Amino acid sequence: MIMQKILLATSNRHKYLEFSRLLYPLTLEALPEDLKRLLPNETAKSYRDNAKLKGMALSEIYEGFVLADDSGLEVFSLHGEPGIFSSRYAGEGSSAQENIDKLLKNLQSKNITDRRARFVCALVLVKKKKILFETTAFCYGIIADRQKGGGGFGYDPIFIPEGYSLTMAELDEKQKDLVSHRGKACQELKAFFLENRMEGHS
């Protein structure tokens, strides 16, 4: 089989860098500027369906592998919020800091002491409009009282994974990759490529 790259269906630079690290030695291709306009709005009601929307849309015009994900944070005592709206929790175009501020404010204003939560990552691999692989992985933990750490992105500074006393943003990359939702999903994808002897290298 001809070796080929995997197009990552995201315009998020942080996600591209993290997935590139997690999927090594598979080779990811960043989404070109002229294709970013083809990314559909995340209008589905589940992570997996949102990932499928993005993967199938790009597969319409890209002949190789397309990898799409949708991720989010769910706080159990907030009935799963922010959930599929994690990236825009504080409104359309909101920053990661604004989303964090809103979440911490909600927990504080409602005097919530049960801060259990989980990260979710739905991953879908598409080629020629056919779904070849899909999985959903989780990382359980709690929401910290305040932000800590300068690593990672998104809600990492306020999420403490099970078995740790540090936030995701305080963990080094190796530690984070072992426990994170994306790390677990990517391990499954790499196993799929290996089991099916498929090529995703440059």
Swiss-Prot record:
Xref: CDD domains: HAM1
Where do the catalytic residues lie?
70 (proton acceptor)
The stretch of residues making up the signal peptide is none
InterPro entries, A to Z: dITP/XTP_pyrophosphatase, ITPase-like_fam, RdgB/HAM1
**Residues engaged in binding substrate:** 10-15, 71, 153-156, 176, 181-182
Where is Mg(2+) annotated to bind?
A: 70
Q: Which HAMAP family match?
A: Non_canon_purine_NTPase
Entries under PANTHER family matching the protein: INOSINE TRIPHOSPHATE PYROPHOSPHATASE, INOSINE TRIPHOSPHATE PYROPHOSPHATASE/HAM1 PROTEIN
Know the name of this protein? dITP/XTP pyrophosphatase
Q: Which organism's genome codes for this protein? A: Methylacidiphilum infernorum (isolate V4) (Methylokorus infernorum (strain V4))
